[in-house]
Amino acid sequence: MRATTSGQQTTVAFESGEIVLLAHDDLGETVDATPRLVVDASGPVMPFADRLLVPTAGSSIEIIDLSGDPAPGESAACTGASDADTTRVGAVFTCDAGAVLFTREVGGALAAEPIPFPVEAPPPTTLSGRADRPDLAGVAGEIGAWLLDVRERRWTLLRSEVPLIRAVALGDDGSRTVVLDIDGRVRVLAPDGEVLVRTEPLLAASVAAPALRDRVQLVVDARHAYLTDPADGAVHEIDHRDGRVARTFTDLDPWFVQQVG
């Protein structure tokens, strides 16, 4: 099962190919009448502008309506769609050769635009950012992190002296990126890769075990970063202005974290 969220809607995709579309405002009532359809998707299905963006056959992203029928708009080449996220600019898919940006044009039609990866570092498989901001970030192999300014359609490589395992763009005026390194430290990087903030190792046990490392999640808001710690059963709330751990929530078994409200 895979959930993909955009704005006030979430698609839940099952291995059978069934897609359930959830409207957040309706979740307090019932989900019995929510749209359900079966699609042959090879990646995350993104709800966007009252349509669904569907990676198909591993090579393109098609646009369908909420009934599953083809909808007006441009399909886009995308091999190996591995992730999808929304920004203030539009919906972004992570593909083998780069990102693909979908935007809504005047009149409602959707347009697709490729943003190819530069060649100086491995491409990310996921891109993450603060909700409703113009930037996304992802890990660039063992070299550092990629920062994607979606508004400018520009990639910036943030080199790191230690490998990184998570990267999330803040999308603020300073174009900062919050990352988790292989030692379990949270760092805040400037657009040139300078380390502005560095914490003590917070997740030493979690990052040392591959199975637990895969469960670690990092999400950010305007003031804090939230970091799950599966080994200790905790979630750390970190002030990303100075690296101070503001709070730690304990007695948990964190598998998924999402900001709401």
Give, region by region, the residue ranges found by the protein language model.
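A short beta-strand motif characteristic of beta-propeller blades
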Residues: 1, 27-38, 69-77, 110-119, ...
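Feature marking well-ordered beta-strand scaffolds used for ligand recognition
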Residues: 10, 18-32, 60-64, 69-72, ...
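Blade-level signature of beta-propeller repeat domains, shared across WD40, Kelch, NHL, RCC1
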Residues: 230-261
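Short beta-strand elements that form the blades of beta-propeller/WD-repeat-like
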Residues: 2-21, 44-62, 84-94, 98-101, ...
